[in-house]
């Protein structure tokens, strides 16, 4: 009898679920890391600023939807937003990009589609929720917020300029950046997969049923879970899909929408660059909009 055979069946089941989730998620994390490396090396804020529309509404919607063309993982989105703001990209363009870029890009949408059994339904609802939050934040910043959102004496950060490198060195730097992002993201993915597998095996079904019977409590619980786990947007759909049978669509949708825009690591990074007053408004607006959106989806569907 091997050492594995001597383990309790619950431990073996947890391990099997953990491996199945992480094996599904890793290819998308790898692709996302490579794309992020390409953006870091080849796409500069100056290039983005060149394409900005002239009117305020156009800039809000530009920031909301440009993430389709420039997919960015939320793990590195905050420093990118800081660079945009330093290049005089308005906050009502930069912040919507912060919210939607990790969600509406093709990689994350396809990962969500795959995680939920090749269903466009959840991927579409996730994208719509993200767009709704982005537009509301853009309107708030564009028409009601009157001050800069950056810290006046923000912490200095080390920023890379790759423009002077030869083509071969740029390609090398793409892979350097991608490897850094892959391993940085991987640690969060491991904890998320482990947590999801433990819930499925060790938390009694009656407890999950009682939680899911109260929609607002289930939604708030999974929103908190998304905040604490700090998962990468290329991988969180697989965690969400594993929780679907226990909590239902609306709470899982809240988990998927809020995770890329509001988690521990993002808030900590925001504190380096952005004013505390803005961060508190950002957290409040995002939380309320995602909560109301998820409740409405639960009622309608």
Question: How would you name each of these model-derived features?
Answer:
Residues 31, 62, 66, 75, ...:
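Short glycine-rich loop/turn motifs that provide flexible caps or phosphate-binding loops at active sites
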Residues 35-66, 208-213, 239-240:
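Membrane-embedded helical hairpins/re-entrant loop segments and their flanking transmembrane helices
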Residues 2-34, 46, 50, 124-223, ...:
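Selected transmembrane alpha-helices and immediately adjacent juxtamembrane segments
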Residues 38-43, 202, 264-265:
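Structural signal for the C-terminal ends of transmembrane alpha-helices
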Residues 24-25, 63-69, 228:
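Interfacial helix-start motif at the membrane-water boundary
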Residues 70-128, 203-274, 278:
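Membrane-interfacial helix-loop connectors
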Residues 24, 28-31, 40, 44, ...:
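Short helix-loop boundary/capping segments at the starts of domains
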């Amino acid at each position: 009898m091997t050492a594995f055979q001597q383990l309790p069946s619950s431990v073996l089941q947890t391990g099997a679920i953990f491996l199945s989730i992480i094996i599904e998620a890793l290819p998308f994390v790898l692709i996302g890391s490579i794309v992020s490396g390409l953006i870091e090396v080849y796409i500069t804020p100056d290039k983005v600023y060149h394409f900005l529309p002239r009117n305020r509404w156009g800039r809000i919607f530009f920031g909301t939807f440009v993430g389709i063309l420039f997919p960015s993982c939320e793990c590195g989105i905050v420093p990118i937003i800081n660079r945009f703001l330093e290049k005089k990209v308005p906050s009502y363009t930069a912040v919507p990009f912060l919210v939607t870029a990790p969600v509406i890009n093709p990689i994350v949408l396809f990962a969500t589609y795959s995680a939920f059994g090749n269903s466009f339904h959840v991927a579409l609802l996730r994208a719509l929720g993200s767009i709704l939050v982005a537009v509301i934040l853009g309107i708030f910043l564009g028409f009601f917020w009157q001050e800069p959102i950056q810290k006046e004496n923000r912490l200095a950060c080390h920023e890379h300029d790759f423009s002077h490198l030869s083509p071969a060195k740029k390609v090398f730097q793409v892979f350097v950046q991608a490897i850094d992002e892959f391993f940085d993201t991987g640690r969060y993915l491991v904890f998320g997969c482990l947590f999801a597998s433990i819930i499925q095996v060790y938390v009694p079904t009656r407890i999950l049923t009682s939680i899911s019977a109260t929609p607002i409590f289930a939604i708030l619980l999974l929103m908190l879970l998304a905040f604490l786990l700090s998962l990468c947007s290329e991988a969180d759909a697989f965690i969400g899909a594993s929780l679907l049978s226990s909590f239902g669509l609306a709470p899982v949708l809240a988990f998927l929408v809020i995770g890329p825009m509001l988690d521990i690591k993002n808030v900590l990074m925001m504190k380096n660059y952005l004013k505390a007053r803005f961060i508190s408004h950002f957290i409040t607006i995002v939380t309320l909009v995602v909560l109301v959106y998820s409740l409405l989806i639960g009622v309608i569907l």
